[in-house]
Amino acid sequence: MPELPEVETVCRGLEKLIIGKKISSIEIRYPKMIKTDLEEFQRELPSQIIESMGRRGKYLLFYLTDKVLISHLRMEGKYFYYPDQGPERKHAHVFFHFEDGGTLVYEDVRKFGTMELLVPDLLDAYFISKKLGPEPSEQDFDLQVFQAALAKSKKPIKSHLLDQTLVAGLGNIYVDEVLWRAQVHPARPSQTLTAEEATAIHDQTIAVLGQAVEKGGSTIRTYTNAFGEDGSMQDFHQVYDKTGQECVRCGTIIEKIQLGGRGTHFCPNCQRRD
């Protein structure tokens, strides 16, 4: 699943490819992806100009002339831009045709991705309704607010970080990496964490996601950026998908368990449960 670094990388790529382009028509081959009224979606998009791109958590934002298109890639969503006629591809579901002859194509093998069209004034309310936490940056991710939220919850810390309410953008890969760096067991109840552990998780969340953005995200199976290029953050993973390998910090064998239905990687020595 694309997490914050992958979505940010896609966003930056699309900025170089489609800003300023005017949509001439829209073609939708899998209508279930569109969460706005379908007729409204098809009626409103033509004649809109893509003014800028943005991101909030794992949501990709297309700022148009007087609307915002919100796209969530879910498990396998990808965007590809073709300067002229695009090739026929099996998993292409939405086509944005531009006046200059180019086409932006949304592909999704699993068909889990979604798109919605809003007026800009409703964007903040939209994310409030999703209970989306702050961005993982020094200015937005307040340590004291984070510690207070942890103290009120019995959820395992991994599950809590994944639910997007504490901080936006973490998924299965980067939660494992953050908790390994912070030396916290993923099954620890949130309210049992010390101030030092909470601080370590806070700081490592910012550091890991920042590094992953610099590396263009992680390509584990199928992720590519808007140019079809792989990310390289997977080369810097210390624990995710390292089951049976030695922990680089202590030499103990990395283990994998199921936690909240998610495969979870950790070092049983560095990340003790008790």
From Swiss-Prot:
Cross-referenced InterPro entries: DNA_glyclase/AP_lyase_DNA-bd, DNA_glyclase_Znf_dom_DNA_BS, Formamido-pyr_DNA_Glyclase, FPG_cat, MutM-like_N-ter, Ribosomal_uS13-like_H2TH, Znf_DNA_glyclase/AP_lyase, Znf_FPG/IleRS
Binding site for DNA: 91, 110
Top-level taxonomic group: Bacteria
EC number assigned by the record: 3.2.2.23, 4.2.99.18
Keywords in alphabetical order: DNA damage, DNA repair, DNA-binding, Glycosidase, Hydrolase, Lyase, Metal-binding, Multifunctional enzyme, Zinc, Zinc-finger
An example molecular function term from Gene Ontology annotations: 8-oxo-7,8-dihydroguanine DNA N-glycosylase activity
CDD domains associated with the record: EcFpg-like_N (cd08966)
Co-factor requirement: Zn(2+)
Record's catalysed reaction(s): Hydrolysis of DNA containing ring-opened 7-methylguanine residues, releasing 2,6-diamino-4-hydroxy-5-(N-methyl)formamidopyrimidine; 2'-deoxyribonucleotide-(2'-deoxyribose 5'-phosphate)-2'-deoxyribonucleotide-DNA = a 3'-end 2'-deoxyribonucleotide-(2,3-dehydro-2,3-deoxyribose 5'-phosphate)-DNA + a 5'-end 5'-phospho-2'-deoxyribonucleoside-DNA + H(+)
Subunit field text: Monomer.
Function: Involved in base excision repair of DNA damaged by oxidation or by mutagenic agents. Acts as a DNA glycosylase that recognizes and removes damaged bases. Has a preference for oxidized purines, such as 7,8-dihydro-8-oxoguanine (8-oxoG). Has AP (apurinic/apyrimidinic) lyase activity and introduces nicks in the DNA strand. Cleaves the DNA backbone by beta-delta elimination to generate a single-strand break at the site of the removed base with both 3'- and 5'-phosphates.
HAMAP family, A to Z: Fapy_DNA_glycosyl
PANTHER family linked to this entry: FORMAMIDOPYRIMIDINE-DNA GLYCOSYLASE (PTHR22993:SF9)
Protein's name in the database: Formamidopyrimidine-DNA glycosylase
Organism: Streptococcus pneumoniae (strain ATCC BAA-255 / R6)
